[in-house]
Structures are given as structure tokens and as C-alpha cells.
Amino acid sequence: MSDQPTPMMAQYLAIREANPGALLFYRMGDFYEMFFEDAVAAAAALDIALTKRGTHLGEPIPMCGVPVHAAESYLLTLIRKGFRVAIAEQMEDPAEAKKRGSKSVVARDVVRLVTPGTLTEESLLEARRHNFLASFASVRDESALAWVDISTGAFRVMPCPPARLAPELARHAPRELLAAEGANLDEIAAEAGAALTELPGGSFDSSAATRRLCALFSVETLDGFGQFSRAELAAMGAIADYLELTQKGRMPLIRPPVREALGGAMQIDAATRRNLELTQALSGGREGSLLAAIDRSVTAGGARLLERRISAPSRDLDEIHARQAAVAHLVDEPRLTADLREALSRAPDMDRALSRLALERGGPRDLAAIRAGLTQGAAIAAMLGNDEIAVLAEAAHDLTGHDALIDLLDEALVAEPPLLARDGGFVAPGYDEDLDETRRLRDEGRGVIARMQADYIAETGVQSLKIKHNNVLGYFIETTSTHAERMLAPPLNERFIHRQTTANQIRFTTVELSELETRILNARDRALEIEREIFARLSRAVLDRAGPVGQAARALAEIDLTAAFADLASGEGWVRPEVDASRAFVIEGGRHPVVERALKRKGEAFVANDCALTQGETPAIWLLTGPNMAGKSTFLRQNALIAILAQAGGFVPARRAHIGLVSQLFSRVGAADDLARGRSTFMVEMVETAAILNQADDHALVILDEIGRGTATWDGLSIAWAVMEHLHATNRCRALFATHYHEMTSLSARLPGVENATVAVREWEGEVIFLHEVRKGAADRSYGVQVARLAGLPPSVVDRARDILHQLESGERQGTGKPAALLDDLPLFRAAPAPAPAGKAKPSVVEDRLRSLNPDTISAREALDLVYELRGMLDGEP
């Protein structure tokens, strides 16, 4: 038995070796096949059968496969499970391969490397979320982060010190992160939920990056896009290099890069995003998040824009005010808002349709999406008219000027085109004469033959003339032998060409019939070929206007988000916040949008609360006390969410809101063990608190809940106390600080700007009623035992806890020492017995000599002599 692989398997192994780190989808007819380790891994991941095909080195070759027509669903599963997939297609027909020899293998090559950050297919993407590919680069003492969504063309870059990388990745949530080999970003990428791809250092060379980017955008210089640092160029260049690698030369439609300033958006770290559940609930799903509660967008582009605005609230006052003005205008025009939303709901996702067309992965439905989007855009622009609101006026302008392209697509496409161009049937009748004729031949071949037969009968006068078909002659004209003399004589013999004579019939053909036969036999293939040519022309026409079409797509998203904010504000009674450059934070009647939504579903009302952290230039801190379950955490979170909504450009759930720009938002609310890194809940809490104290500036908003609860009572109180003092003296920021340590309420008397607030409760016949009202003042009890009873602890445990609490409180009030005696009755708290006192030791000779001295009566010389004497005594002691 030979150890040499077959030619086909040798080809497979060569392609596999050229694409390390990826599963290889190897095209064989109607299937993508996988072999060896790839087959074993894919079969397990996809839950498909693992079979065998031949042998290699004496061992059976594992094999599995997936149908080409269903490949996308399998790709999605593999990508979600962390795999990369190289797709090797057949580059020629088997017939072409045979021309090179009977044993020649069909040429194959990888046409695409599918990775988490380079998806474009509709079935592989979440319509309402971006799919970012990010890149981090460092050049000397500079670092930068770039990110791109090749499914929409959005491309941005920003300076990014290493300390800011984790928060920025949390903001963008990329699916894949590119980094130089040895960058050691595994942990940061894992925290962000991104697949890490390490590239050679050459991919991050800033000089090569400039050349790559100029080639990508077909320009001589990047100066027209702005000035970029070497690190920014390196990060963007690595993306361009990676796209060239994964797309195999079919570069996506990428917009010119936009440079973001580091401080252009409210800074929100990963822990705060998680704690506030901005875009994802703690349970892992979208439901229960702020995004789910407020998303009333009706287009995919609008939904993606909303997620970006919530993830990165603006710090530009002009930008915030312009967005708010647009929302306010639509709030005042409910009829217009309803009409806009109805029209927008019929607008497809043009951004992603454009991207697929650019990558030659699009189909007729993508052309139809462009047609429908531009058509709806024109209607929306007409609705807005000459609107004077800047945001809406700019958007309306971008929706005009597309009439020629709309007319072209409308004329060329049927109303409901099929998914794939290869299936044909998407070009409208009347658009192309050749196609119409070809289709007529394909679909009405018998009718054409019948009409031609009638014409020939009229021309020859032979009523028995027939047009027939067989596999030898193809189509032919047949008459009985009695008409042979007439048919073979002039002038008919000049037109009717003799083909065959039998005993009873004579057969002819004509030039027209031969041409018709060829056209009929080739009509189906020709019709598909013509449609493919038309598809290519239409795609090019769209891509030639990719810039304006992309602007129109973004305009639709902007209008959709504005109308969605207006609909939300009108429906939920939200108000326009006053946002300025001050340090104010005054909320009247504030509500938590997610909790309020959940309560409404149950037919319950949310209790609104005020918050006032305005203290001029001094720190403004509320120290919030109150029982468990009273709503402290909800109050903390709702004020943070109100700040985010205000700076995102929307209205807020309150009666009135005045918010000075928030530069940073920090939240230390709730924690869990980080077992993977060996961190306890308390350690996680301390790490998050340290980040706040080390970073928060005087325009930050900080919310802290139960600092110090994970350790001993006095340790926890000490830490919480010190944290409060640091926030007040050093950070000097606006803060809400919730605690169960009632001793801390005394800080309000000695720290200017610190105020006590409490969540009110009422006791009624032994029951605790939570009022959920935040009032000025301090709580005197936590009602923990009552909450334990409500939670369902056994009555015996609740009664015992009440007794212990009573004794502890009595002892503390009276100073009798009873708490210590009580704790000694509890095994967990009983102190270990003190060791017996040791007997009194006998004094040494050195001690006796020192005691005999009077320091005031000896001279310097005597003191020096005494030192030598004492040293001699020490040396002589046993």
C-alpha cells in the first residue's frame, strides 16, 4: 500500500497547510467536505455524522460534510463556537480539468476566510447590532484603537492609551480584535467577548499602513481624511491588511476613516456598563437591558445607531442640543412622527446591502433593498419638506437626488426578486429585448414552432407540412414524398434545404429553423447569462453611487432614531433635559425606564423620586441609607441612566432634569466572584472601587452601593468611610453613595456638600411597608430581619435572629457587655482562650548595670567607656 496521498487529497493538504488556524471547507460538487482533524472538530461542533474516506499513512481518513446550499447556517454555528473557516471553491468545471488529462484534479483555491469580525451575510449577522472588527496598535509611546464594520462600512480610529483599551472595547463590543504577536491581550479580549487574532509585526508597520490605506481608498494621500498619528495609521493598516487576507482581494466598501477624540464621549468602563445593563442584561440576553426598554426604532440602521448613542453618550453640547431639538420638534408634530415611522418601517437595510454587493456576495434582493430604501427616502424627504431643524434638514437633503438610480432599478427589477442571481427571474419584462426574446423562446418554444409551421404551410401551399424533432436531426420540416418535386424545385429549394429522404417522407430545414433550434436549446442558459450580465451592470450602477447611497442610509437611521425618541417621549411622558457645562445634577420626579416598563406590564405604578447634587464647585454627594428592598439600588441606577439618555440626545424619564455634562460615569453596584482569576466578591468590589477613586474627575458621576459589605463589619465601615472622604476631598465629583453603615451619616455634619437621604418605610402592625420614596434624612434601621422573613426563612430562624438583634442593640445602648457574652454563646464567634501569662523573667546583668546608672552624673568619656563595658557584658552572657 502506498503512503502517497491521492492527487485530490494532496491538493487538500496543500490548501490546508496554507491556511493554518482555520477549518477548511473544501468544495466537492454540492458539498463542502472536511477531512482529518477538521472533520473531527466540525462533526462535534455541528453535531453531524463523522464518516471515513480512503486512507492516509495506513490510517482511515475522517470526513464530514455540509451541503453548499445550507452552508451559511453551519458557518454561523462554527463562528459562534470560536472557529475560523477557510472556504475553498472549485475554480473550474470538471470538464475543463479533464482537458489537462484524465487524472487532473479540479483546480481549487480559498476565496474567503470567514472570521467573527468579517461577516457580511444577512443570515450570519444580527440586523440590529454592529459587527465590529477592532485593531490595537502601539508605536513607541503612542497607542491607538481602530474599528470597522465591513457590513456597513463604518470605519473609525482614536488614540487609546493601554489603560483605556478595556473600557473602549467594552464600548464597541467588537467580535474580533487584531493585535501584534506577543501583545498579551488575551485577557482583555476575553473580557470584551472578542476573538483575539494575532498578526505579524509587519501588519502594524505604519509606513506600509499608509500605502495599504491609500490603495483601499484609491487616493494618493490620506491628508484629505485628516491627520493621523503613527499608531493610528498602524491600527488602521492592520485592518486593511487583514481584510485583504480574509477577503482574498474582494475588498469591502469601507467609508473613509473618521478620527474620534479620546474625550469626545462620556467614559463608561466595562464594570459600569455591566452593572447598569446598558445593552445586555446580567442574565446575558437583550431583554431587561436599557436598550431593550427604549428601542422603538423601526429600521435596522436606526437600532444600530441607538446602540452606539447609548454606548457612547456625547460630551459635545452643540451636538446634544441639536439632537434634542429634533426630538422636541417631532414630539410637537405627532402626525408627522407617525407618518415618518410608517414610511421608515418599509425601508430595508441599505448599508448591508451595499456591502454585500461590493464583496460580490449580494443578490437581486440587495438591489431591491436599495430601490426600496431610496424610494422610501424620497417620500420621507418630501414629508419633511423645508424643515428648519438642522438634524432633520441635513438628513432630508441626503435623501434626495437619487431619482435616476431609483428609476433604473424600478425599470429593471421585478417587484419581488428571488434571493440568488444564478436562479434568474429577477429582471422585469420589457427591460431588455434580447432577454425578452430569449425568455419567449424558452417559455413558448412550442408556440413559436407552431407559428413558424403555419408560415411555412402558407408559403409552400403544402397543407401536410410538419415541423418535427428527433435526437439525430434536431428540428426539421417534413412533407410526404408526393410533394418532393415541388419542394426540391425553384424557388422553394433556395429556402428549404434538403436533409433526408425516406420511403414515404422527405425532410428539410431552413436557416431560420436552424437558428431557432439553437436559440431554443440555448434559451435557458442564455436567459440566465443575460440576467447575470444585467445584475452586474445594475450592481455597478449602485456601487458607482455608493457614497450618496450610504449617506441616504445613514440619514434614514438618524431620522428613525429621532422619531423613535419622540415616540418614546410622547408615549411615556418623558421630558427634554437641560444639559449644560455646569456641575448641576437636578432630577425632579425621576424614574427607572427598565423597572417602570416591567411594572407597567404588571399594572403597577413606579414611584418617582427627586435627586439634587448641585453644590456649585464643591463636591455634591448624597449618602443614602435605608432598608433592604426599599429601592436604593434602583434609585442609584435610574439617575445614572438618566444622565446617559440626556447626553445620547434623547428625552428622559422625569418631570424636570438639569444635568451638567458628565465626563465619566462610574457604577459600583452589585458584584460577583471572578473565579477564573481567583478573585472573591470582595476583591472584585475593591478593584472596581479602586478604579473609580483613581480615575474620576470633578465632572464625573459616581454611584456606589454597599461599599465594604464583603468583609468584617468594622473593616467594611472603615473602608466605606475612607472612600467617602476620598471622593469628597480628592475626586470632588457628584456621587450617590448607598450604605447600611448608619455611623457614616455623621459625615454630613463635617463634610460640606454631603447630604443624608433615606428611602422611607412604614411599620404597620409588625409589617414593613416599603414606600420607595427617597427623602432627606438618615435611616435608623435596616429592617434586615423583616426582609429575611419576607424572603421565606423558617420562622424559627427569623425569631432567633430577632432575639439576637434585640440583645445586640440593648447591649450596645447600655454598654453592659452583653453582646460579648451573647457572641460567646455562638460557636462561630466564640473567641479562642487567651494563653496563660508567662512567669516574670530574671533581670540580666546588663539590665542591672543600666539601672545602677544616673545619666546626669557621667561624662562623655565615662559614657563611651560604659558602652564598651556593656558590650563586654553582652558577649559574656550565656
Swiss-Prot record:
Q: Name one Pfam family in it.
A: MutS_IV
Which PROSITE patterns does the record cross-reference, listed alphabetically? DNA_MISMATCH_REPAIR_2
For the keyword DNA-binding, the answer is: yes
Q: Where does ATP bind?
A: 626-633
Tell whether ATP-binding is among the UniProt keywords: yes
Keywords of this entry = ATP-binding, DNA damage, DNA repair, DNA-binding, Nucleotide-binding
SMART domains named in the record: MUTSac (SM00534), MUTSd (SM00533)
Q: Name one GO cellular component term.
A: cytosol
Molecular function in Gene Ontology: ATP binding; ATP-dependent DNA damage sensor activity; damaged DNA binding; mismatched DNA binding
Q: Which GO terms describe its biological process?
A: mismatch repair
Does the entry annotate any disulfide bonds, and if so which pairs?
A: none
Q: What InterPro entries does UniProt report for this protein, alphabetically?
A: DNA_mismatch_repair_MutS (IPR005748), DNA_mismatch_repair_MutS-lik_N (IPR007695), DNA_mismatch_repair_MutS/MSH (IPR017261), DNA_mismatch_repair_MutS_C (IPR000432), DNA_mismatch_repair_MutS_clamp (IPR007861), DNA_mismatch_repair_MutS_core (IPR007696), DNA_mismatch_repair_MutS_N (IPR016151), DNA_mismatch_repair_MutS_sf (IPR036187)
Q: Name the job this protein performs.
A: This protein is involved in the repair of mismatches in DNA. It is possible that it carries out the mismatch recognition step. This protein has a weak ATPase activity.
NCBIfam families found in the cross-reference section: mutS1 (TIGR01070), PRK05399.1 (NF003810)
| UniProt family annotation | Belongs to the DNA mismatch repair MutS family.
**Name of the protein in question:** DNA mismatch repair protein MutS
- Taxonomic lineage: Bacteria, Pseudomonadati, Pseudomonadota, Alphaproteobacteria, Rhodobacterales
